[in-house]
Amino acid sequence: MERPAILPSGQILSNIEVHSHRALFDIFKRFRSDDNNLYGAEFDALLGTYCSTLSLVRFLELGLSVACVCTKFPELSYVAEGTIQFEVQQPMIARDGPHPADQPVHNYMIKRLDRRSLNAAFSIAVEALGLISGENLDGTHISSAMRLRAIQQLARNVQAVLDSFERGTADQMLRVLMEKAPPLSLLAPFTLYEGRLADRVACAALVSELKRRVRDDTFFLTKHERNKDAVLDRLSDLVNCTAPSVAVARMTHADTQGRPVDGVLVTTAGVRQRLLHHVLTLADTHADVPVTYGEMVIANTNLVTALVMGKAVSNMDDVARYLLGGEPAPDDGKPVGSARVRADLVVVGDRLVFLEALEKRVYQATQVPYPLVGNLDVTFVMPLGVFKPAADRYARHAGSFAPTPGLPDPRTHPPRAVHFFNKDGVPCHVTFEHAMGTLCHPSFLDVDATLAALRQEPAEVQCAFGAYVADARPDALVGLMQRFLEEWPGMMPVRPRWAAPAAADQLLAPGNADLRLELHPAFDFFVAPEVDVPGPFAVPQVMGQVRAMPRIINGNIPLALCPVDFRDARGFELSVDRHRLAPATVAAVRGAFRDANYPMVFYIIEAVIHGSERTFCALARLVAQCIQSYWRNTHNAAFVNNFYMVMYINTYLGNGELPEDCAAVYKDLLEHVHALRRLIGEFTLPGDPLGNQPQEELNHALADATLLPPLIWDCDPILYRDGLAERLPELRVNGAHFQHILWVEMAQVNFRNVGGGLVHNRPVRNENQPLHPHHDAEWSVLSKIYYYAVVPAFSRGNCCTMGVRYDRVYQLVQTMVVPETDEEVGTDDPRHPLHPRNLVPNSLNVLFHNACVAVDADAMLILQETVTNMAERTTPLLASVAPDAGMATVATRDMRTHDGSLHHGLLMMAYQPNDATLLEGAFFYPAPVNALFACADHLGAMRDVGAEVRAAAQHVPCVPHFLGANYYATVRQPVAQHAAQSRADENTLSYALMAGYFKMSPVAFTHQLRRQLHPGFALTVVRQDRFATENVLFAEKASESYFMGQMQVARTESGGGLHLQLTQPRANVDLGVGFTAAYAAAALRAPVTDMGNLPQNLFATRGAPPMLDADADDYLRRTVNAGNRLAPVPVFGQMLPQVPAGLARGQQSVCEFIATPVSVDLAYFRRACNPRGRAAGEVHGEEGLMFDHSHADPAHPHRATANPWASQRHSYADRLYNGQYNMSGPAYSPCFKFFTPAEAVAKSRGLARLIADTGAAASPTSNGEYQFKRPVGAGELVEDPCALFQEAYPPLCASDSALLRTPLGAEEHFAQYLIRDESPLKGCFQHASA
């Protein structure tokens, strides 16, 4: 640094006068005037210059030179090919016994020069050249000073260039060593297994050890900084896993006692300080280092290739002497130049090594990154919403986390969040709401490509039943049922897969043929006859075709993937703080549904009333007497199988006509129905209607007006349904189109009617008005809730919808015997209708008597009034409808649902096999409309039902194909299986069923996810983070021969001056017969990304076919993008993405979501795993390993996959994240590398090649025969091991934040779980040290 003279303020002008040209100062003397303009001249004076001084870095004084044999080779630029020959003698062991005697074996290895160069440049301006040459000197002091300054600047430039070559030598040598240094986690397992890779078993064991070492060795200093022995173990592994050099260098490094240094550890300044302070002890603080380079001179015209055995030789005589006689070259008495410098010498194990950090000494302020500071990409995987099996839902001490007094423990509920820590130790969480950008995107419904791919392979219809819908013929329902039962066994040559109660292990077992069609959480894929539905009554014998149907509701997910325990737990959660049926209500209703002696006459009365409010009011006295008698006899509630009856009873008989405790049952029952109805609103956000339907109808199936109740008594639901023209509703009535009939009296009744007319029932008032509904639309919604949620909760599948023979019912009513009487008499009076003398065989009186129902004459006489409003028949209805606005896309618009319903049918509870009234279908016959109402026992009411049909009905619901099919129904077999298999009480089950009827569509998810309703499937959260690493490199002494040629200067003249380009050729050759260097990621420098919870938003990263309804598409975009933190991808040329308003923790890492069965094995996520659910990174694996599920998962041989919605080809997640379909890319998707076959196969082959190359301890390079360099792909072990192994690591996370606060405690607490950190960062963060 040059300092200017310190000038007193009063002498500034005098000094300028002395040091400047006199003419510059004369201006102040020459002009003396009053004109101020004469004093306007100005000039600048350079009073001082401050500059930084570069200190010359001598490479040979650095610890890095320990690993080098540095030789000056002026003729290097003329060498066409330099070769070094190694002679390696294989050691022998003399042994006794019959072994053949070993003979000496000599191996010869040739290595060629690896050519490199160093470049630097500087320029001299024209003005500086003129000053230096003297041409621009004018004899003044200023020009002399400027000339001196130009010379000084040139000297500084030359010094800077020389310094740059010294620094470049260090940088180049460090990079050379890095190129040939494999990671410790790669070399250590090979040392352990001694290169024995003869078969796949040994190779697999090696890969397993590789994974363990990557996890344990990465950041060992950060993890074990307080554990000195653990760090020393890793350092010992590092310095002992390399092979020694074959060179015996003349110039070497030693400590002050003369002990040679065995190698060098090069690392960062931070790691060096931590090692010296906590781990290593200084063996010496100074070292003797060489300060001169060896010389290699090729004299005369000898162009032979020099063979240098790692020695720094003076001339060719040394070479010849060594080759001919093998004698060491004499020193000729000339001392080798050395100097004692400041150094850190430490002992690691039994080796003395030079500890060096070049970060500040060489690289500071050079704008060149330090090679030992790298980046590590780690992909994390976290399970969200997984529900554990019952055996794992326990707590070691139930009082560890006490719930609010008086409330259920929320930790028994299915988890809806996953909690973890970000890089600053701040607790974060991801909930289902974060997944809106994925699940609420139209790509959720895009299955066209999947269908097209599945249809490429021939499909055979194994079982048409459940996959085919027929159009009913114009015939009586009883006749249609008889014909169906005759043909039913032929429709099922094999048991349909949808009816097989497969457990999760069975479904996911290797080789399961049914697994290939389980591709999407929201779609059923099945093989059906290639005909349009509804089709002919007889199933056509045509080719099969793979079809898809939306599952509509989450309850239709197979039980193997969404088990009963989970559904019940979700139902219990919803029941908390909501209405629950009183125990007396539950007992009374349950008793009625299970009563095998339920009075058959009650069904007759239901049929006579057939939902008519007018008729009910007329028969109110009779109904009240029936209820009272049944209540006194059994303490059960009558008519609870009929929603209309329950509503009318509560309205007209609940104010004193019934016993108080009996009336309370019906009131409580309806309060529960209304509570279930309110549940829909509680999980629906306010919003404008879409497609002429309110948001509640788009969110919940039972609120959807297009779904008819299973039993209807009037045309109200049909009228409300027909108002939704956007859904293209169709209604087939006995194979004909719907027509309404206001009401039918005795004179117009036609019991043989097979047309499309339906009786609407006579209204209570306003009889002369045209057709209008009897009740509002809410009545139909409550009716569906009652039949689809309340009834199954009590019946558990032990009920059946029945057709009614109204001709026989009305005949039976006319057979009643009612004696004339003017007063009420007892049953012992002959004037009472139930007196024995009035019990005429086959009369209605007998039915009342047998049921012990006490009714009087006045009540029975009113039955005669029913002829003014009669029912003709039970009519089958087949209602089909297109998807709603929240589910309609180009792919789904033709996927119409077909649901069956009965008009003027009834629901029969427990079957009474010994009641002759039911035999041979005298009054009632089975007509199941849904699997929920298809009890096999009720087939006994149909004549001529064979044993084969009865046996089949025990396993497959006997729903006729003209009333729908499983795959086309809104409510399917899994819901019925849930109701039948559930062990929950009726309150919980009713809420559980209601939760199962929430729809699965992008629009529906906007409500459910925002309201924190578990959607019925779990999610796998995938996030990739980047971490800055501090590496440590170990190199053996004299392990690299480094040649430096003659400096070459290229001169280029230009108008601005002279440009000088300096180039020095360099070359290097490895001096080992193995890997002589190794490195490891010793410490975590800093997280680069925030390790946060920024969710992926597919609206910003990819396109998809939009929703057909423009308003729905706009609603999704507005709802999902509200508060979005992810900027869109710049795909519009120069248009830049929106920049977030602010960032708190730097670069944000993106979380992506993979739909996962809620029953997935939680243990799968406790270790490193593939987010797809199936391993794909095995050494011998190809693309077939990823998708061929006929073979077991290599990592989990007992199953083919943990997630069929992600691991199979063309599955939902595969179509979403597989880059093969050009819909995803590596820049914006952490899942890309796991789902793209090209990436997975490349990494698999790279891993195989890495193992082979490392095992052979040789890897070919581009310009030499054999160099022991780092094998291709080895760098990924410390840069992106997740991509190489095709596995992601679980971080410390928990479904309950309380478990994070006690990470050393139990991992299980009822339904909540804790996942311990199994990533390479385990132990690096204090807040995540579990």
Swiss-Prot record:
Q: Which UniProt keywords apply?
A: Capsid protein, Host nucleus, T=16 icosahedral capsid protein, Virion
**Signal peptide from the UniProt entry:** none
Per its record, what are the GO molecular function terms?
Answer: structural molecule activity
Keyword Cell membrane (UniProt):
no
**Where, subcellularly, is it found?**
Virion; Host nucleus
The terms describing its cellular component in GO are:
host cell nucleus; T=16 icosahedral viral capsid
Q: What is its main location?
A: virion
Mention any Pfam family matching this sequence. Herpes_MCP
Entry keyword Metal-binding: no
Q: How does it assemble?
A: Homomultimer. Makes the hexons and eleven out of twelve pentons. Interacts with triplex proteins 1/TRX1 and 2/TRX2; adjacent capsomers are linked together in groups of three by triplexes, heterotrimeric complexes composed of one molecule of TRX1 and two molecules of TRX2. Interacts with scaffold protein; this interaction allows efficient MCP transport to the host nucleus. Interacts with capsid vertex component 2/CVC2. Interacts with the small capsomere-interacting protein/SCP.
Which family does this protein fall into? Belongs to the herpesviridae major capsid protein family.
Job of this protein: Self-assembles to form an icosahedral capsid with a T=16 symmetry, about 200 nm in diameter, and consisting of 150 hexons and 12 pentons (total of 162 capsomers). Hexons form the edges and faces of the capsid and are each composed of six MCP molecules. In contrast, one penton is found at each of the 12 vertices. Eleven of the pentons are MCP pentamers, while the last vertex is occupied by the portal complex.
Know the name of this protein?
Major capsid protein
